[in-house]
């Protein structure tokens, strides 16, 4: 049996969290360790759910319905990573200046320039049939925990007290509108495509030299647009301004009123204009030949070539390391679903993991 450290019960009804300090045993004469547990009322749950937290801190979520699993996931992710999640949302929506001051206006402007602003009705239709309902369930769980910490400020992570602000509530659209945290290749590819077009002779398929297009696509230049006159350095600088991780310093923003007199000054500063420009120039130089090709690294070893007789899948998702980690481990168990793996704390579901049959 897994070693568990904490149990949590959730429900509109209730959600229960259990932590098992040791390995449970039914053997005679063996004492079962104390198992601290808590229960919470979580709006949005249709049936009671249970969360078992193992000794590594991984939550194992057991729900009565598929969507309840995502409500529980949002609640537990917020309980474990609330400040990280709130900062991710604020950064992506361009709302940093609201709480951190005018030093963030330009980075907010850049973030909003690349934020998805299309027709959300059509956008939801482009996903799986239940994608919106999953996002609604997940954000309901996040908001349930946000409501809990607002009612009990002692539960707020220290960062909120230091910076003197409250976590925001989420909408389902927040989950899909923010697309530029660490995902940069589409932006850089558009710039490189324009450079390749201008580097080739008229009518040449220069983009095919940069990257094989499958299925075949013929790039078309919009009427009135001159791809050879792009302010490449300025574009890269703007995108860096929108996506670079926030930096903490001691020079700008004072601590919040609730932080205590002995707290050292804390500031959130975006990169300076000079630093952003310098980094953009470095990135520009690193791009080298705009016709250069790129590869990736996803590979599989067949069962007949492994010692276990099972296939091995290896993949690098190309995401940056950070603290707190970008990855968030979760086990989701509900009717029709039983999988464990890593996702991101601000997104429902799993990105990398396995169920009882396959790895993905």
Where are each of the predicted segments found?
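Bacterial N-terminal signal peptides that target proteins for export
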Residues: 2-13
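Residue-level signal for mature regions of secreted extracellular proteins and peptides
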Residues: 16-17, 221
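C-terminal motif of bacterial Sec signal peptides marking the signal peptidase cleavage site
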Residues: 20-22
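Substrate-recognition/specificity elements adjacent to catalytic centers across diverse enzyme folds
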Residues: 26-312, 317, 323, 343, ...
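Secondary-structure transition/capping motifs at alpha-helix termini
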Residues: 148, 333-337
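Short active-site loop/helix that positions an aromatic residue
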Residues: 318-332
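Compact, glycine/acidic-enriched structural inserts
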Residues: 336-360
């Amino acid at each position: 049996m897994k070693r568990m450290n904490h149990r949590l019960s959730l429900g509109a009804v209730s959600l229960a969290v259990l932590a098992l300090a040791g390995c449970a045993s039914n053997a005679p004469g063996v004492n079962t360790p104390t198992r601290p547990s808590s229960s919470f009322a979580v709006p949005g749950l249709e049936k009671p759910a249970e969360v078992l937290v193992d000794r590594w801190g991984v939550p194992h979520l057991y729900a009565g319905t598929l969507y309840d699993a995502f409500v529980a996931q949002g609640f537990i992710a917020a309980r474990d990573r609330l400040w990280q999640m709130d900062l991710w949302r604020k950064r992506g929506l361009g709302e940093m200046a609201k709480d951190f001051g005018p030093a963030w206006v330009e980075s907010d402007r850049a973030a909003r320039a690349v934020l998805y602003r299309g027709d959300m009705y059509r956008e939801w239709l482009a996903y799986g049939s239940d994608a919106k309902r999953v996002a609604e369930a997940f954000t309901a769980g996040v908001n349930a925990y946000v409501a809990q910490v607002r009612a009990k400020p002692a539960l707020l992570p220290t960062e909120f007290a230091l910076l003197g602000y409250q976590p925001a509530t989420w909408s389902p659209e927040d989950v899909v509108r923010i697309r530029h945290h660490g995902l940069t290749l589409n932006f850089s590819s558009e710039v490189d495509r324009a450079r390749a077009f201008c580097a080739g002779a008229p009518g040449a398929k220069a983009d095919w030299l940069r990257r094989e297009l499958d299925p075949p696509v013929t790039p078309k230049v919009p009427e009135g647009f001159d791809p050879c006159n792009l302010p490449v350095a300025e574009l890269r600088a703007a995108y860096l301004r929108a996506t670079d991780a926030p930096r903490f310093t001691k020079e700008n923003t004072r601590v919040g009123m609730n932080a205590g007199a002995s707290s050292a000054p804390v500031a959130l500063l975006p990169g300076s204009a000079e630093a952003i420009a310098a980094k953009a120039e470095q990135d520009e130089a690193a791009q080298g030949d705009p016709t250069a090709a790129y590869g990736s690294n996803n590979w599989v070893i067949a069962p007949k070539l492994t010692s276990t007789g099972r296939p091995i899948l290896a993949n690098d998702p190309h995401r940056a390391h950070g603290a707190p980690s970008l990855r968030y481990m979760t086990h989701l168990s509900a009717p029709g679903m039983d999988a464990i793996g890593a996702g991101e704390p601000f997104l429902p579901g799993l990105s990398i993991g396995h169920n009882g049959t396959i790895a993905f």
